[in-house]
C-alpha cells in the first residue's frame, strides 16, 4: 500500500476493511517521512499452554 492511501484510510471517518497478508489490521497512524505506519492486528488468537 502506498503512503497516500494509508493516510486516506487513517483520516477516514469510516474504518474500512484492511488486511496485511490476509490478517485484518487497524492503521493507527502514518509517518510519511519514514514511510512507516503504526498498525494493530484486529484478530489476535490467544494460545494457552501448560508447562510441565
From Swiss-Prot:
Signal sequence, renumbered to the chain: none
Gene Ontology BP terms: asexual sporulation; sporulation resulting in formation of a cellular spore
Annotated keywords: Sporulation
Cysteine disulfide partners in this protein: none
Localisation per UniProt entry: Spore core
One GO CC annotation: endospore-forming forespore
Keyword Zinc: no
Matching InterPro entries: SASP_SspH
Record Pfam families: SspH
Family of this protein: Belongs to the SspH family.
UniProt-recorded name of the protein: Small, acid-soluble spore protein H
Natural source organism: Clostridium beijerinckii (strain ATCC 51743 / NCIMB 8052) (Clostridium acetobutylicum)
Lineage, top ranks: Bacteria, Bacillati, Bacillota, Clostridia, Eubacteriales
Amino acid at each position: 500500500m502506498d503512503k497516500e492511501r494509508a493516510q486516506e484510510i487513517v483520516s477516514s471517518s469510516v474504518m474500512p476493511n484492511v488486511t496485511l497478508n490476509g490478517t485484518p489490521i487497524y492503521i493507527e497512524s502514518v509517518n510519511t517521512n519514514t514511510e512507516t505506519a503504526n498498525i494493530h492486528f484486529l484478530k489476535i488468537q490467544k494460545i494457552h499452554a501448560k508447562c510441565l
